[in-house]
Amino acid sequence: MAEKYILALDQGTTSSRAIIFNQAGETVCMVNQEFPQLYPEPGWVEHDPVDIIESQISVAKKAIEIASINPDQIAAIGVTNQRETTIVWDKNTSKPVYNAIVWQCRRTASMCDQFKKLGYEDTIRKKTGLVLDAYFSATKLKWILDNVEGARQKAERGELLFGTVDSWLIWNLTGGKIHATDYSNASRTMLFNIHSLNWDEELLELFNIPEQMLPDVLPSSTVYGYTHKEIFGVEIPICGNAGDQQAALFGQICCEPGMVKNTYGTGCFILMNTGNKIVDSKHGLLTTIGWVLNDKSMCYALEGSVFSAGATVQWLRDGLKIVEKASDTEYLAKSVKDSAGVYFVPAFVGLGAPYWDMYARGTIIGITRGCTREHIVRAALESIAYQTRDVVEVMSEESGIKLHCLRVDGGASANDFLMQFQADILGVPVERPTVSETTALGAAYLAGLAVGYWKDHSEIKKQWRLDRRFEPQMDPETREELYKKWKNAVTRSLGWVEK
């Protein structure tokens, strides 16, 4: 009998990817295709939903072809996606009524301010675990219904459907048969009650959203449906589904309460598994659903985001032009023994958790005549580690769980200097796995578990392989002195822009 594989569809903000995994959890083949970003007005970000589905199907077919396997050798498909991005389409024609409004889009910021003035911030946080912000789906969906001609009337007649990107993919892959999402994606809409695990009637009324347009909410690991035969020539079960950061948490096998992963991308996404316990954050962390397995076992998570990580390195390269490529930062940082007292607070667009100061701005402080580009580069990399500690400290305090180890992935996790400094400033080991595609791997694991491709958690747990473990080498006194100065530098950047 021919060997079977799992196909993960990883639909991101700038590209669609398809990755095929074997039973050992190893990458057999990966295909990536970028698609256009649309900026119709300042602060607005959109995608064409047709680009999303076409690019995703294209890379899936190419991956099967490059791997030299037959479509019937795919045991299951797992889906993972950019979260919060909002799509509304016609139930009968499957045509979108408007472009996808992307998670980064700020067009509904003033709408959020109005709801804050009306005093709904606390209600929304208690029900959804989220802060009232344009980042999430609710106000994006309301904007489409309020601004696209005829949309609200059609929605009230039951003719329109809403979904995050996973729902749009599943709808199209199943030929319009399945309109569903999973608990992790639902928890990012600002319409889902994370306590009752249902769409919240009070919030639907508040945002004026007809309930009939919302998808069914299913476990992250269960059979959703089957691909339409015309796509791959055979029907393949779609069995795994989770938002990208939750999928990465699962792919890192952070399955025990207290386990934490950090994805170092443009920003950082730090998630802590809190088990079946909902931790109500008082310091601006998000409480979110990690995943729900088919046996209804539940994982909640705390999430903190750092706005500028890889973006800081990009600025060194493209703005200051003091490095030619991002990878140069490692040897430049290592070429000096410390940052010579220089601190870099990369508040280009304000600061995220736990400060939540949109009026903060970037600062490089502690400069003397002896300061060189190497010191500035080193301070920039160190800032990523300091910001991660800021989030992790709040997570530990609010969850009551002490961090014992940090698992890492994403582009900047390849930087050995940064990973060593991260271990030093946290005072705990940092573990980097051999498989860097942890988001796709998480979706693959969720799909494979649903069809028995992998037996259970313990089987996939054994597959997590260490590339390198960075042990802390800094003495506690130095660590705390450096961190104290970082906090001092941050206070200088807060509230810089006058309101």
Curated annotation (Swiss-Prot):
Keyword Transferase: yes
GO biological processes: glycerol catabolic process; glycerol metabolic process; glycerol-3-phosphate metabolic process
Protein encoded by which gene: glpK
Pfam family, one: FGGY_C
InterPro entries reported in the protein's UniProt record: ATPase_NBD, Carb_kinase_FGGY, Carb_kinase_FGGY_CS, FGGY_C, FGGY_N, Glycerol_kin
GO cellular component: cytosol
Residue sites binding sn-glycerol 3-phosphate per the record: T13, R83, E84, Y135, D244
Pathway where it operates: Polyol metabolism; glycerol degradation via glycerol kinase pathway; sn-glycerol 3-phosphate from glycerol: step 1/1
Name the record gives this protein: Glycerol kinase
Inhibition and activation profile: Inhibited by fructose 1,6-bisphosphate (FBP).
Catalytic activity: glycerol + ATP = sn-glycerol 3-phosphate + ADP + H(+)
Residues the record lists as binding ADP: T13, R17, T266, G310, G411, N415
Keyword Nucleotide-binding: yes
Residue numbers binding glycerol: R83, E84, Y135, D244, Q245
GO molecular function: ATP binding; glycerol kinase activity
The entry's keywords: ATP-binding, Glycerol metabolism, Kinase, Nucleotide-binding, Transferase
Sequence positions that bind ATP: T13, T14, S15, T266, G310, Q314, G411
E.C. code: 2.7.1.30
Protein origin, superkingdom: Bacteria
SUPFAM superfamilies: Actin-like ATPase domain
Lineage: Bacteria, Thermotogati, Thermotogota, Thermotogae, Thermotogales
Source species of the chain: Pseudothermotoga lettingae (strain ATCC BAA-301 / DSM 14385 / NBRC 107922 / TMO)
Role according to the record: Key enzyme in the regulation of glycerol uptake and metabolism. Catalyzes the phosphorylation of glycerol to yield sn-glycerol 3-phosphate.
Similarity-based family: Belongs to the FGGY kinase family.
